[in-house]
Structures are given as C-alpha cells and as structure tokens.
Amino acid sequence: MKVCATIPIKERSTRVPRKNFKELLGKSLYKHIIDNCLAADCFNTIYVDTDSEEIKNYCVSKDVEVIDRKPELSLDTANGNDVLHYDIENIPNYDFYFQLYATAPFLKPKTIRACVDKLLTTSKYDSIFTATEEYGWYWYSSQPINYQPNILPRSQDVAPLIKETTGLYGISKQAYHRYRCRIGARPYYFILNDPKESIDLDTLRDFSRANEYTS
C-alpha cells in the first residue's frame, strides 16, 4: 500500500504575521513538521503544498516533494478539505493520504508513525485524526451537551468530549472519494496524552504557551 503525507504551508497568515516562519527552538516553525515526518519514516512520499519560495527551497534540500499552491488556496476562505481536494487531484496514486500541519510542531515522529500504523492495519476505521479528551460540563447554544442538569453524574463518570487537535488527519483513498472530506464515516480518534503534542499554534497566545513548554 502506498502512503503519502501532505503538509499545507502557506506564506501569508492573518492572526500572526508570517506565523509559519516564526522561530521555535532554533528553527523556523514550518521546518518542525517536515523534519518530524521525515523522522517518522512511514511515508512513501512527503509533499508540501506551498506558495513560498523559501519553503520550496527547504523541501528541495530535504528531498521532499513540492505541490505549487494555487492562489485561491492561499486565501482565508480556503480550508483543509479544499487543500486536500487539490492535492489528491495532483497526486492521485496513493492508497492513504495523511494531512499534517506546521502548527503542530511538537507532534512526535513516533506518534505520526503510530497513527499511520493504526489506519493501515485496522479495517474497522476509514480515517484517523489526533485528538484530546475534554472533561467537564459543556453547553452549546443554551443546551447541555454531555450531561443532564437534573441528573448530575459524578464528576469521574462524566463522558468526555473529543476535540480535534487539527495536527494530523489521515484517510483512505476509497473513503475520500466517497465522502470528499478529510474525515470519513468511521474515524478513529488517536488520543494524545502528552499535552505538548496537542498544541496548535494559531495565535500569539498559543506561541506564548509553546514557549512555556520549551523554556
């Protein structure tokens, strides 16, 4: 079975200017996920979808393939599914596609490898994503989500909510073509027990949190 990684990294960012180029642990943010995917040693090919010449040059130096990002995918209106659609159109000959993000620099190579192994060896699931379990009393749109206020469970019995970390997604080619989405109908959520691995760097506050972990 052929497995590839696709890493979307655009040059421009809105909330944190040049976010993907900010330095973290002595190197630009975008380099961490590329290097971690290489270290995982579980992909037939690693692709970086980018519009940045600097990132393209780094990919060449690491023998990583480049997908030239089309301009509309660099707009704030584009999302991860849009990028995955475009990438699969350009590289259609894989059995499994994994999408990883530069904003998850602490995702360990062994975790990446474990996610790939899980999806490839378990037919029960058609997709996978990294996640955390969130415990507490949650509400949405004035309604309780995971408990009934008039029947209070013990805190240790409360059902957790599953939160995507948005660091890694994987899906079979068959499921992708059926659902046109990076998550299929039978996903496995891979729980990250190390809080550091679940960090998603999207705001200046996130970077401050990351610095706390690395100081």
Question: Residue ranges of each PLM-predicted region?
Answer:
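Short, high-confidence coil segments that cap the C-terminus of an alpha-helix
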Residues: 43, 93-94, 124-125
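Active-site acidic Asp-centered loop
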Residues: 100-102
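Conserved core of the sugar-phosphate nucleotidyltransferase
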Residues: 82-83, 105-196
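N-terminal glycine-rich phosphate-binding loop and ensuing alpha1 helix
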Residues: 2-49
